[in-house]
Amino acid sequence: MTAQDRSSILEGYYKSHWPVECGGNRRQKATEGSLNAREKKAVVQSIRNERWNVMTIYRDNNEIFLGGTMPSFTGPEPFGWLQKIEPESLEILAETPKLPCGDHVWCGAIAAHQNGNIIKVNGNYMHSISKECEAVSYTHLTLPTS
């Protein structure tokens, strides 16, 4: 039987219930607990920012990060970005400067690393970003592939 990622802390990731895309490398898309929505009223909150909003992760309680890139494959040089957002209003609490992604446009990925930083892969760059959305370091990936 396949083990459930939600029942243990994922090695290498920040101690969070959703530190990486799909909840873990095996993409089980499940977490402990429930929505407790039976007696609640559904509320839908959305934003429109003309960006390719790819995914959100949780780092710590109520610390939600949204990552993405620009949707254009032609025109201005593309860039990636990471935002720390408020869970209820979706207000931007912090945002990285434009993060280079090279000529290879790919939606990318984000993960909360066990050291507390957010790792963002975008195009052919990998960035380490603080919880305040400050770029700490980056690596240029030599192969322009996803």
Mark where each language-model region is.
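A short loop-to-beta-strand structural motif that recurs across blades of beta-propeller domains
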Residues: 80-83, 125-127
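Short loop/turn segments that connect beta-strands within beta-propeller blades
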Residues: 86-89, 130-133
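Residue-level detector of Asp-centered blade-edge/turn motifs that repeat once per structural unit
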Residues: 59-61, 112-115
